[in-house]
Amino acid sequence: MPKETGRKSIAQNKRARHDYDILDTYEAGLVLRGTEVKALRAGRASLVDGFAQVSDGEIWLHNVHIPEYTEGTWTNHAPRRKRKMLLHRAEIEKLIGQTQEGGLTLVPLALYWKDGRAKIEIALARGRKSYDKRHALAERDAAREISREMGRRVKGRYR
């Protein structure tokens, strides 16, 4: 069987880009059990309530839901267990410093396969207030309307 290459998406956390200002992103590996890998191969995971936390100089992923493998037996994993993330020591130290600074958190953005290994994209983020969310939504709508109008003008269809 040929080795997998490229990036194949498993799950996205679309809500994170709405709820947080993304400052920086990192790619990390995950320490998984066999049944978790099989469940991910089936494309089943949810990042919605997930977050990462620093504990004893390591970064742990919490609340990411990987459902039990349907064909698994008593060896199945707990769906919301905490999972260790694999990063370089320098990246871990940098993240520890930035998250202890205050107001910053680590949120998962995407879970995907890269060259046959499960990877997670995490973001260093700052939470948005509700008025910031409304402002960002209004800006996005205005930009979309401008782009539509420019498209109409280029095509020669004026209102």
UniProtKB/Swiss-Prot annotation:
GO biological process, one term: trans-translation
GO molecular function (one): RNA binding
RNA-binding listed as a keyword: yes
Record flagged with keyword Cytoplasm: yes
InterPro entries in alphabetical order: SmpB, SsrA-bd_prot, SsrA-bd_prot_CS
Main location class: cytoplasm
Domain of life: Bacteria
Assigned keywords, A-Z: Cytoplasm, RNA-binding
GO (cellular component) term, any one: cytosol
Pfam hit, one: SmpB
Localization of this protein: Cytoplasm
HAMAP family: SmpB (MF_00023)
Function description: Required for rescue of stalled ribosomes mediated by trans-translation. Binds to transfer-messenger RNA (tmRNA), required for stable association of tmRNA with ribosomes. tmRNA and SmpB together mimic tRNA shape, replacing the anticodon stem-loop with SmpB. tmRNA is encoded by the ssrA gene; the 2 termini fold to resemble tRNA(Ala) and it encodes a 'tag peptide', a short internal open reading frame. During trans-translation Ala-aminoacylated tmRNA acts like a tRNA, entering the A-site of stalled ribosomes, displacing the stalled mRNA.
Family affiliation: Belongs to the SmpB family.
Protein name: SsrA-binding protein
